[in-house]
Amino acid sequence: MSILRINDMAPNFDANTTHGKISFHDWLSESWGILFSHPKDFTPVCTTELGYMAKIEKEFTKRNCKIIGLSVDPLDDHEKWSLDIEETQGSKVNYPMISDEDLSVAKLYNMLPSEEVNDGNRTAMTNATVRSIFLIDPNKKIRMMLTYPMTTGRNFDEILRVLDSIQLTSKNKVATPANWKKNDDVIIAPAVSDEEAKDLFGEFRKIKPYLRYTKIDSND
């Protein structure tokens, strides 16, 4: 099994989803994308996760980012469970969910825990994906990967924050500091000289030669 790393090309695949059959790269088109797996339908933590993602999906849409979920459950379960999510979490799931019953995508993206992935005889009936998230850019490159244990629900506001950071730093010679949020000051890249920094950003605060802050409109 290949090991995926940041800046690798996101593997393409065909899959059955609640929105019909897709080819992943074609579905992404020119958008950013979030591919995230959950262990099992009709489970409590997953219900809260998918409900919250449904609630904030519009924020990803504003940023030209599509969302797609995945588990090894059949499509019928996805569709029935979506009704429970809407009932209990107050948000309708409008993004597609992949039914990966043969584990092909889970294995392609290393979404299975080690005690399960090492047994070639395991099936969807005995496997459950961990809580993995992949952020993919319009060039189909993996820009961020996160994996949580099954017992810990994810912070999807953090995923949105990372998307904001990566979109901003992809267009500007900057990085974002610890706990950065959209429209906070950013750090000028060390490779940028003071002279170039003045040309690019105008005013900036110099704490150390390697630590310089400036402000950039995150909506640019």
Regions found by a protein language model. Give the residues of each.
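Chalcogenol-based redox active-site neighborhoods
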Residues: 1-220
